[in-house]
Every structure is written in structure tokens, then in C-alpha cells.
Design a protein with these regions (language model features):
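Short, acidic, metal-binding catalytic loop of nucleotide-sugar glycosyltransferases
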Residues: 22-31
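Glycine-rich, basic loop-to-helix element that forms the pyrophosphate-binding segment
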Residues: 59-77, 87, 98
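Short aromatic/hydrophobic "clamp" motif used to bind/position activated sugar donors
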Residues: 82
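Conserved donor NDP-sugar-binding/catalytic core segment of glycosyltransferases
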Residues: 89-133
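A recurrent flexible, glycine/aromatic-enriched loop bordering the glycosyltransferase active site
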Residues: 124-125, 137-139, 145-166, 183, ...
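A short, conserved alpha-helix in the catalytic core of glycosyltransferases
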Residues: 157-208
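Non-catalytic, C-terminal membrane-associated alpha-helical segments of glycosyltransferases
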Residues: 246-319
Length: 319
């Protein structure tokens, strides 16, 4: 019996995908299926096979982005859990087993994220869960720091969807990834929605993943990435915060936009960032964007209050 479906979105990443699958073949836990959703690759990715894994490749004719590919995979999933895994990763032998054990500790746990380690330096972290602040910033916890300092399982704001397990029944209740994001911050939005509904997200250091990073986009900063991240920053705020919370956080949000504008001006992407912010405002004001806003429910009031306190506390946290 299979408990887990591992969904791997792929776009022109044949070599990366082959390496990722080789490490999945060595897992201590065998009760999983691999579903590769290919976003119209031109490099022969759909020809990749495995003689060991129970594996299926869904070949798309167009690039639906990370969110679209994942949601299509979710629609085809019949297992109680899914693992989202980037194609530019290689995993430890206990990766699946550790994530499954972690999420089964409590039915209140929606997701558990792996310890994502720098591919070139296995002593340095890439991600140990995500934090979110009143500035509207999502911060990769532990990035660039020693793995040895992040060996404790803890609750986090959200999990990086590059290597995390999710509970399917909760996904069906709160919805999958928002395809208006296309890519970037979609996992923060998903974790935020789960937190509003009263669920928890955890970091699990026993599940280890070695992450190349920016393998599909090619660089850490580029026009498309900066634009989407800026646009989605605004959309995450609009979607998940009630109006009174947006007003309460507005001084911090405006400060966050100002600081990021200066930062991207120095990188040569100031105009692109500003364009993304405008696009985020327009998306939030549109009929389509408004339809995606999380409806406020009085039963979730304590969850909103707890989240707001965390947004303030995270302003001063050393990640």
C-alpha cells in the first residue's frame, strides 16, 4: 500500500531529474509513488525512466509554472500524503521515512519541511523552514548558517515547497497552490492559509535534502523572478490578511517595500520590482484576485491574533 505520492515539477531539467530520481531509488521507505509533471520541456526530460521506482510522467504541452504543475499532480493523487520535491535536489536515504514520521505525530500538522542543505557545501543550510514578518517579507530560516545549529524539529510559519510533505485532506479543505502566483511565495501563501485554519507547519531536520537552487531560472535575480516575487508579495498580504490587519501592518509593509526598492535599484532591477508591486496591487483589486481572498471567519479570530503576534516577533528574530 502506498501512503505518499512524490510530485516533482520539471522544466528542461533532464540531468537534474535523473540525479534526483537516483537518490529516491535508495529510500529506506518504499511505500511511495513518484509523479513527475513536465512543463513542456524541450530537452528530452519526458524520456527519463527508473527501473526501481513506481513512477509516472505527465507531459504538458505548455509551461504551467510550479503551481500549475503541482496542482495537476495533486489532482492525480490518491494517497493520504504528498511530498513536493524540486528537481534540483538529491535526498538522503531516510528522507521519505523521516517526513512521514514527522507529519504523523499529530493530525494538527499540515506540513513538514526538510532540512535543505547547500549542494556545494554540506555543512551550510539553504532552508530550515520559512518565517514571515510584518514587513511582508518571507525569510528562509537558517540560510547560509551551519546545519549543526538547526538540528531540532520546530514549528515554523510555513515550509519551503521544494522539499516538504503535506496532508492531503487538509489540502482539499484549504485548497492547493494558488496558480495566480505561477511561482514564488506560493508555499508561504499555502502555509499561511493552513495557519489561519488552525493547523501547524514544522521543520524536520532528520529529512535531509541537498539543493542546487535557482536551477530552472538560472540566476538568483532576474527580471521574471524579481517581478513575480514583488507581485506575489502584495498578493499574499491581500489574500490572507483581513482589512484591519492590513491597516495595522501598513507602516511596516510600506517600509518593507521601500527597503526592497532600494535593494533592487542597487541590483539593477528597481524598475522591475516597482512594476511587480503595481501588478500585485492590480491583481488584488481585480475581480479574479478578490475571488481568491481567504474569507474571514470568527472561529479563526484567535488564529489571526496569534499570527499577528508572530509577524511582529519575527521582525526581531535572528533566523
Amino acid at each position: 500500500m502506498q501512503d505518499v505520492t512524490i510530485i516533482i515539477p520539471n522544466y528542461n531539467g533532464k540531468r537534474l531529474l535523473e540525479n534526483c530520481l537516483k537518490t529516491l531509488e535508495k529510500q529506506t521507505y518504499k511505500g511511495f509513488k513518484v509523479l513527475v509533471v513536465d512543463n513542456g520541456s524541450k530537452d528530452g526530460s519526458v524520456s527519463v525512466t527508473s527501473e526501481v521506482l513506481d513512477m509516472e510522467i505527465v507531459s504538458l504541452t505548455e509551461n504551467l509554472g510550479f503551481c500549475g504543475a503541482v496542482n495537476l499532480g495533486i489532482q492525480k493523487t490518491k494517497t493520504p500524503y504528498i511530498i513536493l520535491l524540486n528537481n534540483d535536489t538529491e535526498v538522503d536515504e531516510q528522507f521519505v521515512e523521516a517526513l512521514l514520521n514527522a507529519i504523523q505525530r499529530s493530525k494538527q500538522i499540515f506540513s513538514c519541511g526538510a532540512q535543505m542543505i547547500d549542494f556545494k557545501n554540506h555543512e551550510i543550510l539553504d532552508n530550515a523552514g520559512d518565517l514571515y514578518t510584518a514587513l511582508g517579507w518571507a525569510v528562509a530560516r537558517g540560510k547560509g548558517k551551519r546545519c549543526a545549529d538547526y538540528e531540532k524539529a520546530v514549528r515554523v510559519f510555513s515550509c519551503c515547497a521544494g522539499a516538504a510533505i503535506y496532508r492531503m485532506d487538509v489540502l482539499q479543505r484549504i485548497g492547493g497552490l494558488d496558480e495566480y502566483h505561477f511561482a514564488y511565495l506560493e508555499d508561504v501563501d499555502l502555509g499561511y492559509r493552513a495557519r489561519i485554519a488552525g493547523y501547524e507547519n514544522w521543520y524536520e531536520p532528520e529529512a535531509r535534502v541537498y539543493h542546487v537552487g535557482s536551477a530552472t531560472t538560472g540566476t538568483r535575480y532576474n527580471e521574471k523572478k524579481v517581478f513575480l516575487a514583488a507581485r506575489n508579495t502584495i498578493f499574499v498580504i491581500y489574500k490572507n490578511m483581513p482589512l484591519i490587519q492590513i491597516v495595522l501592518n501598513s507602516p511596516f509593509i510600506l517600509l518593507g517595500i521601500f527597503v526592497k526598492t532600494l535593494f533592487f535599484m542597487k541590483k539593477g532591477f528597481g524598475a522591475t520590482y516597482a512594476k511587480g508591486i503595481r501588478a500585485g496591487i492590480c491583481l488584488s483589486a481585480s475581480k479574479e484576485g478578490r475571488a481568491h481572498k481567504v474569507p474571514f471567519a470568527g472561529r479563526n479570530l484567535l488564529h489571526y491574533c496569534s499570527l499577528q503576534l508572530q509577524l511582529w516577533v519575527n521582525l526581531f528574530r535572528r533566523v
